[in-house]
A protein has these predicted regions:
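Predominantly recognizes leucine-rich repeat
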Residues: 1-113, 117-164
């Protein structure tokens, strides 16, 4: 599987951890892991996926944090942690994701800590999707990231918030 560029999995309700070998797929560009309701953590080696452009971790409700090694994902453009109910803070060095353009964090109900200081280094970040409570966390950051748009997600399932 060394040339695999995209992995998309959904509804692995009983999987508590991902295989460590997943982090050795060098050419991987997209990783979609959704509805893994018992997944508690990502492998620390996640940062070795240096070609990853899209990381979608939707509805991994037991996922409590993102590994600090995520700072190695220098090509990451889209990070979607929507409905990861247990994430309480973003990684300290999230600002090293120098190509991050879109961050979707709608439904991260435990995320109430101030954003890491390094967040102001996300110069390419253009679009954040979150609820009203999390949007307040971005207010101090927006004075540094002047092109950033924080979209407050609606309670209904309209897709109008998606970037065109």
């Amino acid at each position: 599987m060394p040339n695999l560029t995209e992995i998309s999995t959904d509804y692995c309700n009983d999987l508590v951890e991902l295989p460590v070998g997943l982090c050795d797929i060098f050419h991987q560009r997209k990783l979609h892991i959704t509805n893994y309701h018992k997944l508690a953590a990502l492998p620390e080696g996640t940062g070795k996926l240096v070609n990853l452009e899209v990381l979608r971790l939707r509805s991994c409700i037991e996922l409590s944090n993102l590994p600090e090694s995520i700072r190695g994902l220098i090509k990451l453009r889209i990070l979607d942690i929507s409905d990861c109910l247990s994430i309480s803070k973003l990684p300290k060095h999230i600002g090293e994701l120098c190509n991050l353009k879109v961050l979707s964090m709608k439904g991260c109900l435990s995320l109430c800590n101030p954003l890491p200081e390094s967040t102001i280094d996300l110069e390419q970040l253009k679009f954040v999707v979150c609820e009203k409570e999390r949007a307040k966390l971005w207010e101090p950051i927006m004075e540094f990231l002047t092109e950033l748009k924080v979209e407050v997600a609606e309670k209904d399932n309209k897709l109008n918030w998606l970037p065109k």
